Amino acid sequence: MASDLAMSAELPNSPLAIEYVNDFDLMKFEVKKEPPEAERFCHRLPPGSLSSTPISTPCSSVPSSPSFCAPSPGAQSGVNPSNPNAANKPQLEDLYWMSNYQHHINPEALNLTPEDAVEALIGNPHHHHHHHQGYDGFRGQQYPGDEMAPSGHHHQVHHHHHHHNHHLRLEDRFSDEQLVSMSVRELNRQLRGFSKEEVIRLKQKRRTLKNRGYAQSCRYKRVQQRHILETEKCQLQSQVEQLKQEVSRLAKERDLYKDKYEKLASRSFTTRESPPQGNPGKANADFFM
């Protein structure tokens, strides 16, 4: 009777928890003697834990079962005899452990619809996050070797990424214009402290850029000279055409002047050979007078 009074004093005032505890019929269960190994395993659990099994996954959505392991004599000996209810406190917490997992209760017992249950589960993301953290911690304790492989892989990836960034920083340290315009002495002074392979690679890049620039300058000069020669050729061809036209014009004028000269020469020759007709008649007239 005293134990019943103590249990009634320690039970919460929530009617849901009281109704859930009253539904249990503990008389139909038989007393089972636990082996010493299981008893020691149960005592290894932390004092505030509610379950000896891993926390349920979000897929199952089933809370962990309470631990009914009997307390060890050493644990009972440390209880203050003036407060006997303190020894029954963990057992009572195991009995109404469902009060802390209200979102796992069957929705039909609360006259809730499945939609209300889904909304209740969605409305508690923080609690599910703690479940995941606990499960991850349990997995980390069971399989400590699994954490070594990802960490080693992350270290290798970080080392490769750092090495690659080192190469990129060295190659991007100088622009193409700086590499081409910089003298060899200045470049050697800037490359102190770097590895030999990186220096050789950068000098090969500089040599390639210089050869490319020299080839481009030669090509540009050739193209520019060809344009100049083509322009001069066009100008000379136009001048030749103009001179040809001038020659043809001068030839026509020469022919014209030649014809005029021939006509004038023929007229003067005919006037010299034939005497004038008016002189003999005048002489005859003078003679008759």
From Swiss-Prot:
<keyword id="KW-0217">Developmental protein</keyword>
<protein>
    <recommendedName>
        <fullName>Transcription factor MafA</fullName>
    </recommendedName>
</protein>
<keyword id="KW-0539">Nucleus</keyword>
<dbReference type="InterPro" id="IPR004826">
    <property type="entry name" value="bZIP_Maf"/>
</dbReference>
<feature type="region of interest" description="Basic motif">
    <location>
        <begin position="201"/>
        <end position="226"/>
    </location>
</feature>
<feature type="compositionally biased region" description="Low complexity">
    <location>
        <begin position="52"/>
        <end position="73"/>
    </location>
</feature>
<feature type="region of interest" description="Disordered">
    <location>
        <begin position="126"/>
        <end position="164"/>
    </location>
</feature>
<dbReference type="InterPro" id="IPR013592">
    <property type="entry name" value="Maf_TF_N"/>
</dbReference>
<feature type="domain" description="bZIP">
    <location>
        <begin position="201"/>
        <end position="264"/>
    </location>
</feature>
<keyword id="KW-0804">Transcription</keyword>
<keyword id="KW-0805">Transcription regulation</keyword>
<dbReference type="Pfam" id="PF03131">
    <property type="entry name" value="bZIP_Maf"/>
</dbReference>
<feature type="compositionally biased region" description="Basic residues">
    <location>
        <begin position="152"/>
        <end position="164"/>
    </location>
</feature>
<comment type="function">
    <text>Transcription factor, possibly involved in transcription regulation during lens development.</text>
</comment>
<dbReference type="InterPro" id="IPR004827">
    <property type="entry name" value="bZIP"/>
</dbReference>
<feature type="region of interest" description="Leucine-zipper">
    <location>
        <begin position="229"/>
        <end position="250"/>
    </location>
</feature>
<dbReference type="GO" id="GO:0005634">
    <property type="term" value="C:nucleus"/>
</dbReference>
<feature type="region of interest" description="Disordered">
    <location>
        <begin position="266"/>
        <end position="289"/>
    </location>
</feature>
<dbReference type="InterPro" id="IPR008917">
    <property type="entry name" value="TF_DNA-bd_sf"/>
</dbReference>
<dbReference type="InterPro" id="IPR046347">
    <property type="entry name" value="bZIP_sf"/>
</dbReference>
<dbReference type="GO" id="GO:0003700">
    <property type="term" value="F:DNA-binding transcription factor activity"/>
</dbReference>
<feature type="region of interest" description="Disordered">
    <location>
        <begin position="52"/>
        <end position="87"/>
    </location>
</feature>
<comment type="similarity">
    <text>Belongs to the bZIP family. Maf subfamily.</text>
</comment>
<dbReference type="Pfam" id="PF08383">
    <property type="entry name" value="Maf_N"/>
</dbReference>
<dbReference type="InterPro" id="IPR024874">
    <property type="entry name" value="Transcription_factor_Maf_fam"/>
</dbReference>
<feature type="compositionally biased region" description="Polar residues">
    <location>
        <begin position="267"/>
        <end position="276"/>
    </location>
</feature>
<dbReference type="GO" id="GO:0003677">
    <property type="term" value="F:DNA binding"/>
</dbReference>
<keyword id="KW-0238">DNA-binding</keyword>
<feature type="compositionally biased region" description="Polar residues">
    <location>
        <begin position="74"/>
        <end position="87"/>
    </location>
</feature>
